[in-house]
Amino acid sequence: MSDKITVGEAIARTLEQYEVSAMYGIISIHNLPIADAVGQRGNIRFVPARGEAGAVTMADAHGRFSGLGVALTSTGAGAGNAVGAMIEALNANTPLLHITGQVEKAYLDADAGFIHETRDQLGFLRACSKRAYRVNSAEQAVAVIQRAILDAQTVPCGPVAVEIPIDIQSSLVSSSVLSQPVAPAPLPAASDEAVERLYQRMKQAKRPLLWLGGGALACADAVRKLADAGVVVISSTHGRGILPDSHPRSLRAFHNSPSIEAILTQCDLTLVAGSRLRSNETRTWTLPLPRPLVQIDIDPAAANRNYLADEQINGDCGALLNALAARLSPGEKVNAEWDAEIATAIQQAESALRQQSGEYAKLNDAIAAALPQDGLLVRDITVSGSVWGSRLFRAISPLCNIHSLAGAIGMGLPMAIGTAIAN
């Protein structure tokens, strides 16, 4: 019995090893060996799309919940159609694998007019991805796929593209090319020195502020403990729900509200955890943030990108926030008068937003009443994305309120489909 399998089957088996449950895509002559193998084996659900942007968007949503989304597209125009959705996944730091085809090896980069050929496909994939790879030999295909998955799942996560020439996809290789999945390295533990410095800053502050971003999505328990201890919490739109709106010290995502800005000006410490401090949440970086400002991010390149920090801590938000929460006593920073000011400011911010939203506030309330308490809201951009959906609609847990971070229009429906399948 031969141990030979096609590269397409080797890729399908590899994805199964990574416990991929769904692949989103469009079947084409330039990816048939992979699509055939997935279909014939029957272990991965293939979800067809009407366009490549929709396929990658569905995979993006799936990856946000499952830890790895997978999309399959065609060469040239097909891969190009995926670019906008890849940019969204890049903004959201979604662990996503985008597999696309290429013309036969003999015609690569020849600009010969081969069907589906485009100039510098790898170049535009690099521009919209965390990493992009080309498979140059059949024997290396599985290794490159594993490298791509490792890159996608390594924090900070992101979409990774792999292009595979069609003749390589159909080539036969020994099943010995298959190997065990490679897991990302564990995140670093919080250093005692960094935790001690954070604790001393927190101890000295009377009105500390915690600003959360998408990099803190897995930190809900630590954030709640800090809020219970008296720390005021505000989040990016992507970070909403890490601390439920119902918590009395949650400023939600009311960054641009005058009443909330008045609260921020009274804080005497800002701890930024896993946030880019994006332009639309900081009035294009003119919003004054309380000093001292300490930034926690796993990515050293995040340091001082938009605001000059008094201290940058390169590390895992979860490890550092958990260690800090363990040092604070319950209610250590609680102040009844301060809590009353916070409650008034939140009420004023919500009232002003309801007035600004007009009839949309009624739509918001109707959806909230119809949706189960643990239901998920997925929305498009424009009014639902930028006004009532991002700030008024309730958020009770991380990723319960999905939106476009890149500002792309039209991603709502495929994002909702991917979210539903992942859940």
Where are these regions (language model features)?
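Structural signature of the thiamine diphosphate
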Residues: 4, 21-22, 64-100, 126-178, ...
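Glycine-rich phosphate/diphosphate-binding loops that line cofactor/substrate pockets in enzymes
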Residues: 10-20, 61-66, 151-156, 194-209, ...
